[in-house]
Amino acid sequence: MEQKRCISSLTLEQLSAELKALGQPGFRAKQIFHWVHQKLVSVFSAMTDQPKTLRARLEEQFYIAAPQIERRQEAKDGTVKYLLRMADGNCIETVVMRYHYGNTVCVSTQVGCRMGCRFCASTQAGRVRNLEAGEICSEIYTAQKDIGERISHIVLMGIGEPLDNFDEVMRFLENITSPEGVNIGMRNISLSTCGLVPKIDLLAEKKLQLTLSVSLHAPNNEIRSGMMPVNDAYPVEQLMQAVRRYQNTTGRRVSFEYSMVRGVNDSDACAKQLADLIRGMGAHVNLIPINPVDGSPYSATDAANVRRFQQKLESLGVNATVRRRLGSEISAACGQLRRDEMNGKA
């Protein structure tokens, strides 16, 4: 028996081709796309304006991505963290963060991660598989239905390296920004990368109006390679050249993520090196007090030291902010909920 495919992963153009092959009129594609990506149904039987025969055929060949909420944690500030179980039984994490300008969802792009960053819980068991475009969409739809409020912003900063799943992430972006779907503005989307240089160049060619957020975390190769194995393949100099090419091609400002680790990357010397590295780029730096991760040798810099580091950067002409810590009383470290579930603790 042929394995069912995820209809949520098809772009409108791809869906049109599939329906044409089934002998359906052209207008059916938009109708079905609306049901999946705008009305957010999870079963074909809910598509009441479609012929029963077509619904039956779709049921035979496709499924709609609709993960189950395995675990839900809500913090006092309204942050909600989900452990979602996908159709194949694998689990991922999704987080809703509430801000004055709207609701932001942090989505995962892979089941696990193979980048090996030593301060991150989501990479400790490696990568199991890539998520399909429709599965990434379903994280947003599940969260939106659960909280009963519109999602206005997306950050691709959950489990996985988005550019290591390039094609599916591009299809996800096409579907999630489609006027025929939930129509989230591309400028309201941030994509994070640990620094896959060839994929940054590939992304630049797309000239998308999203915000690229580079997980830098260190101002030199010695420290960065100790924290992030990807730096051995794409050292700081190559990464920064790619980021500058990206800026020149897209005209978009880039932000840098910098996780503050006690005694590793939080010195005044590091602040000066960081300022020298990004000077003239008009870039923004997000300073992140790391969350404790079981099995990691790293610990967070104290708040006073984070503030001092920020002030040092600003005195050197760098725009830097300290990331607001949302949901601090829930399992906040990225990948921690999934790892607990894998270890039988959830």
Model regions and ranges:
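Generic beta-strand structural signal
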Residues: 80, 92, 103-107, 115, ...
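P-loop NTP-binding catalytic core
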Residues: 88-102
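Short linear Ser/Thr-Pro motifs
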Residues: 75, 108-109, 122, 192, ...
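Conserved alpha-helical substructure of the radical SAM core
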Residues: 124-153
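Canonical Radical SAM [4Fe-4S] cluster-binding loop centered on the CxxxCxxC motif
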Residues: 98-135
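Auxiliary Fe-S-binding modules of radical SAM enzymes
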Residues: 1-92, 244-253, 258-346
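Conserved AdoMet/S-adenosylmethionine-binding subsite of the radical SAM
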Residues: 144-320
